[in-house]
A protein has these predicted regions:
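Signature for the C-terminal beta-barrel architecture of outer-membrane proteins
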Residues: 139-266
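Residues that define the transmembrane beta-barrel architecture of outer-membrane proteins
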Residues: 49-57, 86-92, 130-134, 161-167, ...
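Outer membrane beta-barrel
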Residues: 62, 69-154, 278
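Outer-membrane beta-barrel channels and translocator barrels
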Residues: 64-68, 99-103, 142-145, 174-178, ...
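Residues on the lipid-exposed face of transmembrane beta-strands in outer-membrane beta-barrel proteins
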Residues: 57-63, 94-100, 136-140, 169-173, ...
Length: 360
């Protein structure tokens, strides 16, 4: 990786345009979760149903230093509806992006947090509850490979608080109509000089394979590093998911929980709408992925779902989804989502240069 960056940074001069532009991204969402609370050992629990609605704004300035290198400075703001506080959360956006190979990107600073991990490992609700991640990231989206590796440093150690970081990886290889993937998420609490308690580790991984019965043809995405297929598809995936948690218990004793399960998914796309049937076999009070959807702690469920995205323009989309699940005890849960996304940008300045000076 470092050798590729070094080689890329010492290429002969080439034409480029330095430019500064302003961008604004907006996502207005309504998400309703109808669930029955289930007590699980703290800090894990299946929460009761709730409704989240609001707008997430991302205003930013982007400066293109040279071809393949740009800096992004801005902010992320959460504006929940129905609250008196206005902006409930704000995060800075400070990123350096280096596109060093076709389809490959290295990021330092604020990360792209739309990780393609399974919901059991990385809950998609975090999109609305945890606005930003900061650290380092390597992403790839090519014809046969999809990669997302990142380090998110969430908390620095103090005299009374443990440090916290999250290390994640998603690697998907797509030879022909087959798919193989490896997914890993490690959540660590620790440090050496604090009174916040002993070190804790939560490690979850998944091994998966799949097959599509129709030929998958890669299509350039409207959004960077998000895979889209230019054809209808029907197929299945199977994942083995394992969770290992070691947390502090009472009287400075550690409590270790380990469990695993199988996730089967049958999917098809018709009328530009995604349909799927998913079966989860496994899970228990000992299946405790710290950043995963807590519904997987409940043993065994079947789920039907559908999702559709309407593109009104290249920069305006509406997405709707619905899923309903039946659990082993007969409980029915369902989730509805409606979101509207739009993007605008305009150039503030542009300076064209015929060549980039060679570095000596």
């Amino acid at each position: 990786m470092l050798s590729l960056l070094f080689f890329w940074g010492h290429q002969p001069g080439q034409a480029f345009s330095k430019s500064l532009k302003f961008t604004l991204d907006s996502k207005t969402f309504f998400k309703n979760l109808e669930r029955k609370p289930v007590p699980v050992r703290a800090p894990f629990r299946i929460p009761s149903g709730e409704t989240r609605t609001g707008t997430i704004l991302k205003p930013a300035f982007q400066y293109n230093i040279k071809k393949g290198i740009n800096i992004e400075l801005g902010g992320l703001m959460d504006l929940p509806f129905g609250q008196d506080d206005g902006i409930s959360e704000g995060e800075p956006v400070i990123s350096l992006h280096i596109d060093y190979l076709p389809g490959w990107r290295f990021t330092a600073g604020t990360l792209n947090r739309e990780h393609p991990l399974l919901d059991a490992i990385f809950d998609d609700d975090l999109e609305f509850t945890d606005l930003a991640e900061h650290g380092f990231q390597i992403q790839a989206d090519t014809r046969k490979l999809r990669q997302d590796f990142w380090l998110d440093w969430e908390l620095n150690e103090t005299s009374t608080r443990r440090e916290k970081f999250v290390l994640g990886n998603y690697t998907q290889w797509m030879p022909g109509n087959f798919m193989f993937d490896l997914q890993v998420l490690w959540v660590h609490f620790g440090g050496q000089n604090n009174s916040g308690g002993p070190a804790e580790n939560n490690f979850t991984y998944a091994l998966g394979m799949g097959y599509s019965f129709s030929k998958n043809r890669f299509k350039e995405s409207r959004e960077p590093y998000i895979k889209k297929w230019n054809s209808q598809k029907t197929g299945f995936t199977v994942h083995y998911i394992n969770s290992h948690d070691r947390s502090a218990g009472t009287s400075d004793n550690f409590v270790t929980n380990k469990d695993s399960g199988l996730l089967f998914k049958l999917f098809t796309t018709h009328w530009d709408t995604d349909f799927y049937f998913r079966v989860w076999s496994g899970g228990s009070r000992h299946f405790l992925p710290r950043n995963g959807d807590p519904i997987y702690t409940n043993r065994d469920f079947e789920e039907l779902g559908m999702e559709k995205t309407w593109w009104l323009d290249d920069d305006i989309s509406i997405r709707g989804s619905y899923q309903i699940s039946e659990h082993r005890d007969g409980t029915i849960t369902h989730t509805e989502l409606l979101s509207v996304q739009w993007h605008i940008d305009f150039t503030l300045s542009k300076n064209h240069s015929d060549t980039v000076p060679n570095q000596h």
